Amino acid sequence: MSLSSKDKATVKLFWGRMSGKAELIGADALSRMLAVYPQTKIYFSHWKSLSPGSSEVKKHGKTIMMGIGDAVTKMEDLERGLLTLSELHAFKLRVDPTNFKLLSLNILVVMAIMFPEDFTPMAHLAVDKFLCALALALSEKYR
């Protein structure tokens, strides 16, 4: 699924509106993923607490959203722009790429809750397509 120029513009516009709450979105989305898909906890077993609101969840949620924010600036070539991150997840962290989609679903849920007026059907579509493209780019080194 490719991103049209309109999709890219919509993602950039929406990201601009929500970026001030990116940390909260990341922490909530990660908390939801860990609760709804408990099998994902295996990647974070070294943390002291996987509870929603724990310092580890908040910190990693922020890291995730900073990475997504960086990807927004690299939409023209996500594979090249996210190569280092793809290598990290594939070779060092060994994260099953299915988890990228699981996290994306939770990010969409949180965005819809936090921005009901701005997260229109068109924004939803564009952000979903972007997160799918992002997940695909992060999966590049798995092939």
Swiss-Prot record:
Involved in oxygen transport from gills to the various peripheral tissues. Pfam families: Globin. GO terms for biological process: hydrogen peroxide catabolic process. Red blood cells. Belongs to the globin family. SUPFAM superfamilies: Globin-like (SSF46458). The modification N-acetylserine is found at S2. Heme b binds at H89. Hb 3 displays a Bohr effect, which is enhanced by organophosphates, and a Root effect. Keywords: Acetylation, Heme, Iron, Metal-binding, Oxygen transport, Transport. One of its GO terms (molecular function) is oxygen carrier activity. This is Hemoglobin subunit alpha-2. InterPro entries: Globin, Globin-like_sf, Globin/Proto, Hemoglobin_a-typ, Hemoglobin_oxygen_transport. Residues 2-143 form the Globin domain. CDD domains: Hb-alpha-like (cd08927). It comes from Arctogadus glacialis. One of its GO terms (cellular component) is hemoglobin complex. O2 binds at H60. Hb 2 is a heterotetramer of two alpha-2 and two beta-1 chains. Hb 3 is a heterotetramer of two alpha-2 and two beta-2 chains.
